[in-house]
């Protein structure tokens, strides 16, 4: 046993210090990034935000809607090959370039993903997703995927520390997914006692990944557009959002009615709801590590997407970053004990 005594920080522990700016307007800020990935060699340009691969967020409808904002969607792994074929038949090449194909690590997952990728060469992203990216089996699967799909851009996770981030990149991942327990419907930290404050995880993993020519995506912990800006400021190349994109017309959650008001169900992918839906039950040897919540319907996702992108542009103007690419080097975090004046929050 050992104790690390240096301070670890989440998004709520900091604010970004404003700096002198020469920008005249938020409209002057360029949010598009251009990347060339380490292993695949593929080049990509777009807004580096990703809708999470949850079946109540990462839907085909979400992918179609967010593509118009140049935002990626990690489509959840529970669609069949036939459903993928129908989606591809009805989608433009521009939509498909904003899609990530998600997979687990079983042999069946591998074969299904292979079939999906064979449907259309425009599918260039693979998202290999498990709750615990520290297992040897996971690293081996990433290496297997890299060998099988040498020109596909592979995103793999989740981890929260530099040494594991490096191992995944050396095994073939182009992008490492960072985050254990910060999600809005994740209960891993209270069920297991395991986790890592998200901002510190991003800072540590970004440093490790960039040293090897890899990239990271901050996955979880964002509740406001300001948190998205903090993740980018901390060094994230991409930011993945779940709860902030849930409850919309495109989110795919089941709608329930209570006292005449309609709500949409949103649940974590290790929750009892998810396991009952996709596996049939919660296995005897495990506990659910997610929860289910009812969200008021939030309408089309386009309004939320504009709000997020608007907040991100504004953050850049406050620190004098004319491009999102510059936000990290223009960011100075200050530790705080308050984020906002909450006097009217309950009205």
Swiss-Prot record:
Any idea which GO molecular function terms this record carries? Answer: GMP reductase activity; metal ion binding
E.C. numbers: 1.7.1.7
Supply the enzyme class, top level. oxidoreductase
UniProt feature coiled coil, ranges: none
Summarize where K(+) binds, as residue positions: 181, 183
**Reactions catalysed according to its record:** IMP + NH4(+) + NADP(+) = GMP + NADPH + 2 H(+)
Would the keyword Metal-binding turn up in this protein's UniProt record?
A: yes
Q: Where is the active site?
A: 186
Q: What does this protein do?
A: Catalyzes the irreversible NADPH-dependent deamination of GMP to IMP. It functions in the conversion of nucleobase, nucleoside and nucleotide derivatives of G to A nucleotides, and in maintaining the intracellular balance of A and G nucleotides.
List the PANTHER family hit by this protein, alphabetically.
GMP REDUCTASE
Task: State the similarity comment.
Answer: Belongs to the IMPDH/GMPR family. GuaC type 1 subfamily.
Protein's UniProt name: GMP reductase
Species lineage: Bacteria, Pseudomonadati, Pseudomonadota, Gammaproteobacteria, Enterobacterales
Q: Which gene encodes it?
A: guaC
């Amino acid at each position: 046993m050992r104790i690390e005594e240096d301070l670890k920080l989440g998004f709520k522990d900091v604010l970004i210090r404003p700096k002198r700016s020469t920008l005249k307007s938020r409209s002057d800020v360029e949010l598009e990034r251009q990347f060339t990935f380490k292993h695949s060699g593929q080049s990509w340009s777009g807004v580096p935000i990703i809708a999470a691969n949850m079946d109540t967020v990462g839907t085909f409808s979400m992918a179609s809607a967010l593509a118009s904002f140049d935002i990626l969607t990690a489509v959840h792994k529970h669609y069949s090959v036939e459903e993928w074929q129908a989606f591809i038949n009805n989608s433009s090449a521009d939509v498909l370039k904003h899609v990530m194909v998600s997979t687990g690590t079983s042999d069946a997952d591998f074969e299904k993903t292979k079939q999906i990728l064979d449907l259309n060469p425009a599918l260039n992203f693979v998202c290999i997703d498990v709750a615990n990216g520290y297992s040897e089996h996971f690293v081996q699967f990433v290496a297997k995927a890299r060998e099988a799909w040498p020109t596909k851009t592979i995103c793999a996770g989740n981890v929260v520390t530099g040494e594991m981030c490096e191992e995944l990149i050396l095994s073939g991942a182009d992008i490492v997914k960072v985050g254990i327990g910060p999600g809005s419907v994740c209960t891993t930290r209270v069920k297991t006692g395991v986790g890592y404050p998200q901002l510190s995880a991003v800072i540590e993993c970004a440093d490790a990944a960039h040293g090897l020519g890899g990239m990271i995506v901050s996955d979880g912990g964002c509740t406001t557009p300001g948190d998205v800006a903090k993740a980018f400021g901390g060094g994230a190349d991409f930011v993945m959002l779940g709860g902030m994109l849930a409850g919309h017309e495109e989110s795919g959650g089941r709608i329930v009615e209570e006292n005449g008001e309609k709500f949409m169900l949103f649940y974590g992918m290790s929750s009892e709801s998810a396991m009952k839906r996709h596996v049939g039950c919660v296995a005897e040897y495990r506990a659910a590590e997610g929860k289910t919540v009812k969200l008021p319907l939030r309408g089309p996702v386009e309004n939320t997407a504009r709000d997020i992108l608007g907040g991100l542009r504004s953050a850049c103007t406050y620190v004098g970053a004319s491009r999102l690419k510059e936000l990290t080097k223009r960011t100075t975090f200050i530790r705080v004990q308050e984020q906002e004046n909450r006097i009217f929050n309950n009205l």
